[in-house]
Amino acid sequence: FCGNVTYGNSTTEELKARGHKISFIHFDNPSSSNSSKPLFLANDPDVSLPYLIKSQVYTIPSPRAEKELRLSLERLKPDIVHASLTLSPLDFRLPELCNEINVPLIGTFHPPFDAKNRNLTASTQQLTYQLYAPSLAKFDKIIIFSEPQKNVLEKLGVPKEKQIIIPNGVNENIWKPFCEKNKKYDQVKNKLGNER
């Protein structure tokens, strides 16, 4: 799994464990993708949105995905929508869709961030931030992962009061540094060296 999938699954499971009713809307083509029927069942909290291209970097939704998303949100009537932003054109439509059905929208902005790099990767990251900033400013809240990231988004027009920093964006009780040193740890460390 990529980080987005792990993040989505762990967030969903944690909310379910706390007694919240969760619906999961994600990109996944059903076997009969040419069908014009809705991609959900009446009582099913999970919805599959059709796509044309899907990778770990971006997703191109099918032409009917936006309609499916709107119908799903109207049917599910959520109290709140959380979007794990996946570099998809639908990310930019979410603020308007949620506003139309009067549902608060929170997003987690996953694109990588490195304030120090000055290379092609950093330029691509900067372009992604510039493209997303106007849309992120329309979300009710945006989850990000660091203070430097917050500063960049604020400079690009995303109000600081809409940004919430969750370091690493993970459950720190599960994902934490290994602290118990033992013989196997020392063997691995000796093989890899102290810089790793």
Where are these regions (language model features)?
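An aromatic- and histidine-rich active-site surface loop
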Residues: 80-103, 107-114
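Nucleotide-sugar donor phosphate/pyrophosphate-binding loop at the beta->alpha transition
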Residues: 104-106, 114-138, 180
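N-terminal subdomain of nucleotide-sugar transferases
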Residues: 1-31, 101-103
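A short helix->loop->beta-strand "cap" motif at the edges of active sites that frequently abuts
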Residues: 101-105, 139, 160-162
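A short beta-strand/loop micro-motif in the catalytic core of glycosyltransferases
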Residues: 138-146, 164
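A short helix/loop element that forms part of the nucleotide-sugar donor recognition site in Leloir-type
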Residues: 176-193
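A short, charged, and often flexible helix/loop element on the N-terminal side
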Residues: 36-71, 83, 124
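Carbohydrate-associated surface elements
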Residues: 28, 148, 169
